[in-house]
């Protein structure tokens, strides 16, 4: 027996990375998992080095970031890798979620895999928001003020929760210090959840584009899919390097290069680009509590898919009707992100409300109805 199989610890690695049987029909969309793992490693590694030089004191936070950029050897590289790494993390995550929606990765027997993935998504958004606040530029300060104020919409205890989050009566030194603590902690929780994600995936193995059981035609991970993953890793690193070395501030916001000032409100308060769709949904609801519930509902509705999708065929590969509405949903989501950059004025308010309705209608109305129609068509075709 090979040593990698006889050794207790190497056998664990072997079963996940080397001899893990994968369906032979999986395409390059299945490579997003390895890219997300790479992004997580980049974020944790660069984050640890940044934490060595960062000061969480509100008076020194902005200056410490400038110190990293100017005085720390290769500090500019570490910071730009971390900031652009967050954007690439979300790009890969959105594509990964889109792949799961298109190919029905949420359907039984992989419901737990999907559920853990949604939890990872929520934690990643939390980590991104906390990290964005730590720079303590103008957008960091006002973003922290606006988002934490959302908890004041909770009846009876909302204001107490906001005061507890701030550690004071406004965003101040205790706020930044506790945000830094949680921002350092959450990535390790995400790493633990990723291990759980892999463990649950390992039970039934990966799905495939055909939507059928692939147990009859599988290949080992090493030698086939490891090399396939490396191809996309190299492509990823090329685009990542282009941003880090040639256009590092493109995905950021110019107002965040101004020190935070609670006495001056920016012309437009917007989060990072990867949170814009959810910000649009929040702004589309006139009622504060309703907007908060709707915003959190945009993520939690993903957990409803295993229930609302009643199709007997996994994935949209052979379903024309589902394909059309899926790409309509993707277009709508991109439009939500674009509307998040716009000011709250006519016609963007109405457009945001329409896009919000379409977003929820896809999961709660269109998916159940379309799956029922396609099931009926499938049965009628079989009878012929």
Curated annotation (Swiss-Prot):
Cofactor(s) essential for the protein: heme b
Superkingdom in the source lineage: Eukaryota
GO cellular component: membrane; mitochondrial inner membrane; respiratory chain complex III
Pfam families: Cytochrom_B_C, Cytochrome_B
Transmembrane segments: 32-52, 76-98, 113-133, 179-199, 225-245, 289-309, 321-341, 348-368
Membrane topology, record value: Multi-pass membrane protein
Keyword vocabulary terms for this entry: Electron transport, Heme, Iron, Membrane, Metal-binding, Mitochondrion, Mitochondrion inner membrane, Respiratory chain, Transmembrane, Transmembrane helix, Transport, Ubiquinone
Keyword Cell membrane: no
Free-text remark on how the cofactor is bound: Binds 2 heme b groups non-covalently.
The keyword Metal-binding is assigned to this record: yes
Protein name in the entry: Cytochrome b
Originating organism: Eremothecium gossypii (strain ATCC 10895 / CBS 109.51 / FGSC 9923 / NRRL Y-1056)
